[in-house]
Amino acid sequence: MCACKFATYNSNIGAVKLLLDKGADINCMRKDGMSALSAVCKNLDLEFRSDFDTIKLLIERGADVNLTVDGHYTPLMWLIKNLSENDDRFSESKISSIKNLFESDDDDYFFENKRKNKYNALKLLLDNGANIEAKCDGETPLLLACKLSSEITSTKHIKILLKKGAKTNIESNDRKTPLMLLCKNCQQYLENEAVDVLIKYGKANINYQNSIGETALIYLCRISFMSESVQFLLEKGANPNIQDNSGNTALHYAVKRHEFEMVEILLRYNASPEIINKKGKNVFSNMHKISIGVVEQLCRYNINIQLSAAQKYSILQTPSFVNGVKLIGLIESNTKIKTIMDFTINVIPKKVLKIIYHENSLKMKLVKMAWLCRNYSIDKIITMENFWLFDYLNVETIDQLKYKITELTKYES
């Protein structure tokens, strides 16, 4: 280790300055890509202003802000890793003040907090040419920040990266997008705000599909139990009916994993259970593997489930014969109800129109009366059979009758 690098590890800015004045190579580097600047970014201590001053000194003296070797972090990446892993957890009493801080667009106010050294260091690197799209094992600084986002404070440096133009519609070597990584790590409500920032500031496409066709919504339904995050994405406009390269939708995975709450949320946002994947299957195809709870949810949303004889046989071959019988009964009952409902919905308009326009209906009597009023056919208006209508309309004179009839029929063609 060169003397300059040793001095940075020990936060000794005086020693660093002295060594640089004596001609130390500011860009000397170990085989693992660790330079003096990388070392201080990796080990930056929140409590010491001298660490920030050391970074500033190194940059002013000509340190290469992107110096590394293939397969290793740049100084910017080391700093992001430091920010993500070493920030203290916040108590509930501090969350509201952090939220207010996060929402501020005033950069001076944004950094007036106990972590200002770290965030100012991040700004300093970016303002001096740090490559925001540099990659290490397929990860950019933004992907790394989202991957390590388990703390409320991660929202801040994600926002800084986005303001500097970090690309959001990209994927890592393991096919994760920034949005997927953030959603996976959503364990507190402010992480959802980080997702919101990714969409707002980074223009992240919420329906962006990676190389295997997965959206963030499909990814969550395939691997996560966080139904709140699923709902959050749907509220932000995620399409529940997009298919991945296998033809599966988010609902396919949620049903397969028996995630009842996810299934209900997806159905509420119009996820279609009838979409066929590339194996020719929809969510009903493996009905013998679906729990009664999921079927009950599908029935509540008036989904028509048609069972073939083979499917019924498979259900009855499951270990719990009683549950199999119950499942078939539930499906058949729902099918009958839906058939009756569909018939009723189809018949109602025809019946209603027939009733409304029947010659003895109130509507037709009013239309007839309006016609007579316009033609001043008083002898045909004042008849015994029309007395009930006068009482119904509560009129005592012809003028009152004309006014009421005109008002009631003025929108009739």
Swiss-Prot record:
Pfam families in the record: Ank_2
InterPro entries in UniProt: Ankyrin_rpt, Ankyrin_rpt-contain_sf
Phylogenetic classification of the source organism: Viruses, Varidnaviria, Bamfordvirae, Nucleocytoviricota, Megaviricetes
Repeat (ANK) residue spans along the chain: 1-28, 32-67, 68-104, 105-134, 137-170, 174-208, 212-242, 246-275
Keywords assigned: ANK repeat, Repeat
Protein name: Putative ankyrin repeat protein L92
Statement: the UniProt record of this protein carries the keyword Repeat: yes
